[in-house]
Amino acid sequence: MIKKIKIILLIMLSLILTQSLIAKENFTIEQNDEKLELLYFPKKIVTDSAIISRFLAALDIELVGVPSSTTKIPEKYNGVQRIGRSGMPDLEIVKSLKTDLIVSTLYSKPALKPKYDNLNIPSFYLKVDTYDESMEVIEILGKAFHKEEKANAILKDIKHREEILHEKLKDKEPKKIAIIYGNGESFFMTGKNHFLQGLMDKIDCENIVTSIDNSALLKKSVPFSMEQLIKANPDVILRLPTSQTKNGESFEEIFNANPIWKLTKAYKNKKILDIDPTLFRMSAGVNSIDALEELYRYVYE
């Protein structure tokens, strides 16, 4: 009798373990209306995005393919196969890696999903346009890839650093900021729908474009106007260089050639500064807290 009970218990334990293993093999990831469910846990993961590669590296997720990019790919993936330029992968390479999941950005979905579908490779697209979305993606990836402990540690550190900034801001006067970017041929100012707007909000800064162009509320950028800039008279002007002009002139040389800048508070405060395009040209992703701290230093220190 005891022997039979032991056998039954062993069978039950075996079934429980089997079900547990099966459950672990399943994979689910979702964000807003995007959802992907697989009946297996992916082992050969590729990303075609430099931004996404930094999220995955922070969570210690192994990849078999990453993009070639002017934006730095994490050192963790130094020996990993390059699949072509960000947003323009070499599909033959992707296929040859026996890829079983591609993680990309929502921005790339319209162009790339049909191509991946033709290869019968599942793909998922993350929205990382804003600071808050980037924080959400850390949690989403942590849950999907069973890296909750790492994700929680990252988010805890970010929360702590946010609290330090919040304390520093208590005795600071809010500033009016203009963020200008371009290549010397044309210039723009960041609108309310730009990644940088979320950072400005978090350090109590006003984006001057809201007083210049009502449509800025819906845009990532608005055309630059020197006349409007002088009228708005920002406390701080941050320049985001993207490249040199055709004549080889730098962003700074072009601005120095125009003495009208001297009429602004920013000039008088010695607060016309160039900012790092690596952190600020687009969403900084998992490094968004670094961008927030850096923006604070540019504005207030």
Question: What is the predicted function of each stretch?
Answer:
Residues 31-33, 81-92, 214-226:
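Short helix-initiation/N-cap motifs at beta->coil->alpha
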Residues 73-76, 108-144, 276:
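Flexible loop/hinge segments that line or gate small-molecule binding clefts
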Residues 47-97, 101-106, 205-208:
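A short, structured surface patch at a secondary-structure boundary
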Residues 133-136, 143, 152, 166-167, ...:
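Structured C-terminal subdomain patch of bacterial secreted/periplasmic proteins
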Residues 2-8, 18-51, 149-180, 241, ...:
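Bacterial Sec-exported substrate-binding components of ABC uptake systems
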Residues 91-104, 121, 225-239:
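Proline-aspartate-enriched helix->loop->beta-strand connector
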Residues 128-140, 178-199, 245-248:
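Extracytoplasmic ligand-binding site segments that recognize negatively charged/polar headgroups
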Residues 67-71, 197-218:
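His/Asp/Glu-enriched short active-site or ligand-binding loop at hydrolase and phosphoryl-transfer sites
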